[in-house]
Amino acid sequence: MEELKRQLDQMSEHNRKHYNYELSKLSEAEKQRLEALVVRMVKSGAKKPFEWAWSEFREGIPQWARFMVLKGMYQSAYDIPGNIDGSDEFDQETSNTYQEIVDKLGKEKLHQFLTSYAKSMLYNMIGIFDEGNFDYESNDSWLLMTQDRESGELGKPISGLHEDFLEFDQEIELS
């Protein structure tokens, strides 16, 4: 229960008392399960691993999966060099155009714009993932779900991504 203690020690006194009370009601097996979730969130780079793990533990929401989807999207938005390289697949002039814009605006200003633009596009995509199909003449829709890698068995839906996306940069360490 080392990581649980470490996370509780970082909380305000009020929150620490609340969660210590909640933890006192758990069995040893439940505490170990929560500890494993917290450790998993720490290893994933969450700034608030206890909150994410507690939500998964208490509400049954696949928060680790939600966190990893959002983290991957955010990392993609910040990967300007990788996105410029990848965009060459769609327009071979992209690298030249990028350099022309850098020469006029500067790299920092352009990267700030491109990151915001990428986040906006990703947020729109999240709406598609979260809401499914708006074509009401079709019975087909979709759902983002967890899946067991070994068995292929489908797990729980990964939904509500839009709820955390806008402020997600406060949830992770970006390198």
Show the residue positions of the predicted features:
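Conserved, folded interaction/cargo-binding domains in eukaryotic regulatory proteins
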Residues: F113-E131
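Mature extracytoplasmic domains of secretory-pathway proteins
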Residues: Y98-K119
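Generic hydrophobic segment detector
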Residues: W52-E56, Q75-E89, Q112-S116, G160-S175
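N-terminal low-complexity, intrinsically disordered segments
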Residues: E2-L105
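Acidic, proline/glycine-rich low-complexity IDRs
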Residues: M1-Y21, S95-N96, I126-S175
